[in-house]
Design a protein with these regions (language model features):
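Bacterial N-terminal signal peptides that target proteins for export
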Residues: 1-6
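Hydrophobic membrane-anchoring helix/hairpin
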Residues: 19-127
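Hydrophobic helical h-region of N-terminal Sec-dependent signal peptides
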Residues: 7-12
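Amphipathic, coiled-coil-like alpha-helical scaffolding segments used for oligomerization/assembly
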Residues: 79-82, 87-88, 93, 113-186
Length: 187
């Protein structure tokens, strides 16, 4: 009886001290070890791909989408080359490189877009917008296409520069879309 009680207690303790990680298709989970007693903590360098993995209760995880992600940015009061205030809806599509999500989380954190991409992207777009007149920004598709290409190139260069200075940023720029300008409602 004592052996059975000990065995049941051991099994219950083992089950209670574990959690499961189950990323869906198109996702990777990054394990973050936080041992209470033994072992070393930090980001596990091997991502958990689609399926199931059991971890210690003290281990947390971050789910990272491996599909292209769209980040919409609304630019209010962007200035054209004649200081006309215009509003824009823009979008950058980024994709985390396969099996490199642990590097992303380790180097830039769970909020990597907000931490290192968002403001730089907005500033680059504003810079290009200020080179053109309101008519071109509202109706000339060729101008908007040239801005898309230039912003994409500049963002790729920015990510490469960040990777050299602060550790790899394993993200690819899939596409940039600058919508046509809308007259600012305040004017």
């Amino acid at each position: 009886l004592a052996k059975n009680m000990l065995l049941c207690g051991t099994i219950l303790f083992g089950m209670a001290s574990c959690t499961s990680v189950t990323p869906d298709a198109g996702e990777e989970a990054v394990l973050i070890h936080k041992p209470y007693i033994f072992g070393s903590g930090g980001v596990d360098e091997t991502p958990v791909e689609t399926g199931l993995k059991y971890t210690w209760f003290s281990t947390s995880y971050v789910t990272v989408s491996m599909l292209p992600q769209k980040f919409d940015e609304k630019l209010d009061d962007a200035t054209s080359n004649d200081n006309t205030l215009l509003d824009f809806n823009t979008q950058i599509q980024l994709q985390v490189q396969d099996n490199r999500s642990p590097i992303l989380i380790k180097n830039y954190g769970e909020n990597w877009y907000e931490n290192v991409i968002q403001e730089q992207y907005r500033n680059i777009v504003r810079g290009y917008i200020s080179n053109f007149g309101p008519f071109d920004l509202m109706s000339n598709r060729e101008v908007l296409d040239s801005i898309n290409i230039a912003v994409k190139r500049d963002m790729e260069n920015y990510i490469a520069s960040l990777s050299q200075k602060h550790g790899t940023l394993p993200v690819d720029v899939v596409n940039v879309v600058i919508g046509r300008a809308l007259p600012n409602e305040k004017q």
